[in-house]
Curated annotation (Swiss-Prot):
InterPro entries the record matches: Mito_inner_translocase_sub, Tim10-like, Tim10-like_dom_sf
GO cellular component entries: mitochondrial intermembrane space protein transporter complex; TIM22 mitochondrial import inner membrane insertion complex
Topological relation to the membrane, as annotated: Peripheral membrane protein
GO BP: protein insertion into mitochondrial inner membrane
Motif (Twin CX3C motif): 37-61
Alphabetical list of Pfam families matching this protein: zf-Tim10_DDP (PF02953)
Protein name: Mitochondrial import inner membrane translocase subunit TIM9
Intracellular or extracellular location(s): Mitochondrion inner membrane
Keywords: Chaperone, Disulfide bond, Membrane, Metal-binding, Mitochondrion, Mitochondrion inner membrane, Protein transport, Translocation, Transport, Zinc
Domain notes: The twin CX3C motif contains 4 conserved Cys residues that form 2 disulfide bonds in the mitochondrial intermembrane space. However, during the transit of TIM9 from cytoplasm into mitochondrion, the Cys residues probably coordinate zinc, thereby preventing folding and allowing its transfer across mitochondrial outer membrane.
Disulfide bond residue pairs: C37-C61, C41-C57
Length: 89
């Protein structure tokens, strides 16, 4: 995003707003991951420790989620690049 038309104070404010929004998005993503993997993997509530199966499930769940997020991010970047090329022509 181009903030060059704003003065220094406005640029700083916009940067803080964007940073706050990014942190909120990250926390929402993290909370969703925790909830999804907990609901899918936590089965035995008789112990504080995770079972071997639960540990494996959590690892697989987080790996799958992160790979999916990476793929979505890559597709978004590709789409953004196409949009920028289309706007430049």
């Amino acid at each position: 995003m181009d903030f060059s038309q704003f003065n220094g104070a406005e640029q700083a404010h916009m940067s803080k707003v964007i940073e706050k929004k990014q942190m909120q998005d990250f926390m929402r993503l993290y909370s969703g991951l925790v909830e999804k993997c907990f609901n899918a993997c936590a089965q035995d509530f008789t112990s504080k420790a995770l079972t071997t199966n639960e540990t494996t499930c959590v690892q697989n769940c987080t790996d799958k989620f992160l790979k999916h997020s990476e793929r979505v991010g890559a597709r978004f970047a590709e789409h953004n690049a196409e949009q920028m090329q289309g706007a430049g022509q």
